[in-house]
Amino acid sequence: MTEVLDILRKYSEVADKRIMECISDITPDTLLKASEHLITAGGKKIRPSLALLSCEAVGGNPEDAAGVAAAIELIHTFSLIHDDIMDDDEMRRGEPSVHVIWGEPMAILAGDVLFSKAFEAVIRNGDSERVKDALAVVVDSCVKICEGQALDMGFEERLDVTEDEYMEMIYKKTAALIAAATKAGAIMGGASEREVEALEDYGKFIGLAFQIHDDYLDVVSDEESLGKPVGSDIAEGKMTLMVVKALEEASEEDRERLISILGSGDEGSVAEAIEIFERYGATQYAHEVALDYVRMAKERLEILEDSDARDALMRIADFVLEREH
């Protein structure tokens, strides 16, 4: 795991440099500070690193994908700022959320300006066909993120969400941006159509595994590792693969009990919900689905020539399920 973190640190520095070049001219100073708050707060920077590694894995120069990598991270940060407002989350990456420090109006503006700067980051690479194609990928991912968020919000009022609907939601909300990172990075590296498709699939599959593993950690990890109470997704009534599976498989009595616990905010009942997950194999099922997606992601890399970048992508796929938060 340490080796993967070193890889991410090395490649994220390239993206961070381009990000700071793009946002340094934001005025007034209050908006600049609000905009850079989460960017400088840390995070693993998996998405921009994947863009750079995908470029390198097809024989390109990672620097050629720096604009795309920066754009992907700017879009991710914009989405986090707005998510925190919508969910009224007060902490992010161990720091107070942007809206907590600067208020909601300024936080909305910070998200908006980062969203705008993302496109500036891409077009700084010129107007070649590669840049145009990569820009189209980035634009499409932004639409999907909004669609995914809307689906997620709609699920809060439903108890009949199917597994297919859930997978569509997490693909759009989480995996689409990761797939955009790997696809756009490959395009900037001059990849063949077959390589672009393979790397897009790789990003999609590890993105799906990433979100499912997040849901899984919420019930099997501990508060210290998570940085939040175990089962907080259950207390908040969030729809996860485990909830979908348990509601589908449970007896009428257990189903009604689980429904009464979801979104109740009662942390004392969370353990009971987790027991219901275990009873019907929902927890193990989620873990196995995530494992399958990682396996499929690694298989898609087999068409690439052996290289350090390809090896790093393989390691990152495994890292998705090795992380504890």
Swiss-Prot record:
Superkingdom: Archaea
Biological process annotations from GO: isoprenoid biosynthetic process
Protein's recorded name: Short chain isoprenyl diphosphate synthase
Cofactor note: Binds 2 Mg(2+) ions per subunit.
Organism expressing this protein natively: Methanothermobacter marburgensis (strain ATCC BAA-927 / DSM 2133 / JCM 14651 / NBRC 100331 / OCM 82 / Marburg)
Principal subcellular localization: cytoplasm
Subcellular location: Cytoplasm
Keyword field contains Metal-binding: yes
EC numbers: 2.5.1.-
Gene Ontology cellular component terms for the protein in this record: cytoplasm
Binding-site residues, Mg(2+) 1: 83, 87
Sites where the protein binds Mg(2+) 2: 83, 87
Database matches in PANTHER family: GERANYLGERANYL PYROPHOSPHATE SYNTHASE, SHORT CHAIN ISOPRENYL DIPHOSPHATE SYNTHASE
Binding-site positions, isopentenyl diphosphate: 44, 47, 76, 93
Stated family: Belongs to the FPP/GGPP synthase family.
Residues holding an all-trans-polyprenyl diphosphate: 92, 173-174, 211, 228, 238
